[in-house]
């Protein structure tokens, strides 16, 4: 078998087509109902085996550091704990805006995990990657799977749905970064009037949806984010 020295992968963004917050769990997280949709916007990740035997990281942005707050680094550490892999150099070209809700960091983590599996020929399935990747972030499992998924639990419980859409997504990202922890901390009033999950999925029939038939899908975070960041 030919051993790989380098892999280059696209790390795709996502949009949430509606997001309902249901309740706060005893572990401090929130149960949600949402639809994750993978989109073409992507970062680029190149993983190269390193002769130095250590992990190295580089990027076109300065705000990403070589520490565990960087989800590329966290993903490498997660895989290394299981397989004791050698060192690599991870280069990340960022195109997805941070704090935009497009899942850039989680996507990067999932892509690094899949890239490490490929370059080191690791015998680990997507399902197994999904299970361990939730330790990094609640929506990382979605990026292991991709396509279109109903997300429940904290976002890690995924159900594939058929999704037919004609047209394009228009992604507008103002110069604002929304911290996820802050957004969840402001959400108590929304939870008091949260719509049950059964209502959220009333527009589905047989887990098949056509976006052209949907007039509007609400995102509960809008009620706390828009007043603070009207732009």
Name every feature range the model reports, one short phrase each.
Residues 73-88, 114, 215-231:
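A short, flexible low-complexity segment enriched in Lys/Arg and Gly/Pro that occurs
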Residues 56-57, 102, 180-185:
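Short, charged, solvent-exposed linker or helix-capping segments at domain edges/interfaces
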Residues 51-65, 112, 134, 209-219:
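Short, basic/glycine-rich phosphate-binding loops at helix/coil junctions
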Residues 100-131, 142:
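DPxDG-like acidic metal-binding loop motif
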Residues 2-100, 118-127, 163-164, 173-176:
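ATP-binding N-lobe of GHMP and related small-molecule kinases
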Residues 145, 150-231:
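Conserved, helical-rich catalytic subdomain that frames metal- and/or nucleotide-binding sites
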Residues 14, 24, 95-101, 111, ...:
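Short glycine- and Lys/Arg-enriched binding-loop motifs that mark or flank ligand-binding interfaces
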């Amino acid at each position: 078998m030919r051993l790989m020295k380098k892999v280059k992968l696209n790390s795709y963004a996502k949009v949430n087509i509606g997001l309902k917050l249901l309740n706060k769990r005893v572990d401090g997280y929130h149960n949600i109902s949402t639809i994750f949709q993978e989109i073409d916007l992507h970062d680029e990740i190149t993983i190269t085996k390193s002769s130095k035997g250590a992990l190295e990281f580089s990027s076109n942005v300065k705000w990403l550091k070589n520490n565990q707050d960087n989800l590329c680094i966290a993903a490498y550490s997660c895989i290394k704990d299981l397989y004791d892999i050698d060192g690599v150099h991870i280069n990340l070209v960022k195109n997805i805006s941070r704090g935009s809700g497009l899942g850039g960091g989680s996507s990067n983590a999932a892509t690094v995990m899949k890239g490490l599996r490929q370059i080191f020929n690791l015998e680990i399935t997507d399902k197994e990657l999904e299970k361990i990747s939730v330790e990094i972030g609640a929506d990382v499992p979605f990026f292991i799977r991709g396509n279109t998924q109903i997300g429940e639990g904290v976002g890690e419980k995924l159900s594939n749905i058929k999704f037919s859409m004609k047209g394009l997504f228009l992604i507008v990202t103002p110069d604002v970064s929304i911290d996820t922890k802050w957004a969840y901390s402001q959400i108590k009033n929304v939870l008091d009037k949260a719509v049950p999950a059964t209502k959220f999925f009333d527009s589905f029939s047989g887990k098949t949806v056509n976006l052209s038939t949907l007039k509007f899908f609400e995102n509960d975070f809008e009620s706390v984010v828009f007043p603070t960041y009207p732009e």
